[in-house]
Design a protein with these regions (language model features):
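Structural signature of PLP-dependent enzymes
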Residues: 44-46, 229-271
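Conserved beta-loop-alpha segment that forms the PLP phosphate-binding cup at the N-terminus of a helix
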Residues: 49-92, 102-104
């Protein structure tokens, strides 16, 4: 495994939440594809580029367990959401989460939608439901996994929300979720999910996708062609979209059940270890389930110690954020904890 992800050979990489790793095989595919473009020029664009995008849609439909007609390629999660918001009536009231990914609030604000926010807490899902009962909302928009704290929204709770508010449109930023956790779009009650490929899907930059229910398009009185027209202003990079298709196919070749189980085990192990050391925010420690992303309460000096020990992570707010993916090992987590314990003594 490590040989396919060269970065893993020279560091303890706990930074997938910031940037997923390139595989050696993806690099080889991109190199061969670029050389094909060099040789064929316009024929590459008119022939192979089309098939590359078709394959990306096909692989994503398998990953998301949905029909290909529900998949729309974009350059990123934010680009897809930004475009899609153009088709939502301006009088719709949004419910957001406080301290969610900043661009979500910024886009809703830029589009001049009225919105309210629910504060982060250990009982977030119940707080969302309570707020929905207090006043009328047309759209609930949130990240499945919080980029900062790593809080994992209980996706099973969506059913309870939809049962009580069947007309509510639920839109989800799945960038920190898809590729990390199991998900079945057709069985879910989410109306639309927006994803970037460069984190947990390990697809490099410049690619992403939307997954939209037909019932949502009908509700908004728009067609798939309307969505394509929103996203196809200009052009997409075939190499970026092809990388998404290749990376998703490669990820599925590892057996997704094994990938997700490994993530669950590593995440639980790290969660308990950090909770024991009192390094997590209280509202995170009090929850039963968590993602594989953690922001720990340590200062900049400790961040520098982690860097000196060749542990890749990133500063977030007043703490340090780490994340584990299937290519990490328990030994790497133990090494991180060892460095951490030694530094805080």
């Amino acid at each position: 495994m490590k040989s396919n992800y060269p970065t893993l050979e020279n560091c303890t990489y706990l930074n997938t939440a910031y940037c997923g790793l390139y595989s050696e095989r993806l690099l080889q595919w991109r190199t061969e594809t670029d050389l094909d473009f060099v040789a064929k020029g316009d024929y590459f664009k008119s022939e192979r580029a089309i098939n590359i995008e078709k394959n990306a849609v096909h692989q994503l439909s398998k990953l998301m367990r949905t029909e290909e007609t529900n998949i729309f390629l974009s350059t990123s999660c934010s680009a897809g959401l930004e475009a899609f918001l153009l088709k939502i009536p301006k009088d719709f009231h949004f419910l957001l989460l406080n301290d969610d990914y900043p661009s979500i609030t910024e886009m809703v604000t830029d589009h001049q939608f009225k919105f309210s926010e629910v504060s982060m807490s250990s009982t977030l899902e119940s707080s969302v439901l309570e707020e929905l009962r207090n006043r009328p909302y047309q759209v609930l928009l949130f990240s499945a996994v919080q980029y900062n704290s790593g809080l994992l929204f209980d996706m099973n709770f969506i059913e309870e929300i939809k049962n009580e508010f069947p007309e509510l449109i639920i839109l989800v930023d799945g960038t920190q979720y898809i590729g990390n956790q199991p998900f079945d779009f057709n069985r879910s009650l989410i109306d639309g999910i927006f994803v970037s490929g460069y984190k947990w899907l390990l697809a490099g930059h410049g690619n992403g996708f939307l997954c939209l229910k037909k019932s949502l398009l009908n509700r908004l009185k728009i067609s798939a062609i309307d969505v394509f027209n929103l996203l196809d202003r200009g052009h997409r990079a075939p190499i970026a979209m092809g990388s998404l298709g290749f990376a998703v196919e490669e990820l599925m070749s590892y057996d997704l059940d094994v990938v997700f189980q490994k993530n669950k085990e590593l995440g639980n192990y790290l969660f308990e270890a950090l909770k024991k050391r009192n390094l997590l925010e209280d509202f995170i420690s009090e929850r039963k389930k968590h993602s594989t992303i953690f922001t720990i309460k340590v200062n900049k000096a400790l961040f520098e110690i982690l860097k000196k020990n060749n542990i890749r992570c990133i500063q977030r707010g007043s703490g340090v954020r780490i994340a584990v993916h299937f290519y990490n090992t328990k030994a790497e987590v133990d090494f991180f904890l060892q460095v951490l314990d030694k530094a805080v003594k």
